[in-house]
């Protein structure tokens, strides 16, 4: 019985830590860039775009396709960085727990 109570306490502790981690991640702002800094996309920790900055030199009619590609690339860069931060925070939180490889948290 004592083991079950101890385990329940650990579960509640883990839940509180997970909620704190999720709040920290949601508050993050991550920049992704492309074109050597000509395009910058800022995402929040949930992956929502907060801002987009484009160097005025890209506003030429024949450069529209390039601009579109750079925006997509900057967004991907920011999203990849956000996912890496989330994965690292999750690894730190779950260190030592027997969680199967590839299982994404929170469930």
From Swiss-Prot:
Keyword annotations from UniProtKB, A to Z: Cytoplasm, DNA-binding
Task of the protein: Binds to DNA and alters its conformation. May be involved in regulation of gene expression, nucleoid organization and DNA protection.
Source domain of life: Bacteria
Protein's name in the database: Nucleoid-associated protein R00231
Pfam families for the chain: YbaB_DNA_bd (PF02575)
GO molecular function ontology, one term from the record: DNA binding
Assembly and oligomerization: Homodimer.
Any one of the GO CC terms: cytosol
Disulfide bonds: none
Keyword Lipid biosynthesis: no
Protein family: Belongs to the YbaB/EbfC family.
SUPFAM superfamilies, sorted: YbaB-like
InterPro entries hit by this protein: YbaB-like_sf (IPR036894), YbaB/EbfC (IPR004401)
Annotated PANTHER family: NUCLEOID-ASSOCIATED PROTEIN YBAB
Compartments where found: Cytoplasm, Nucleoid
Keyword DNA-binding: yes
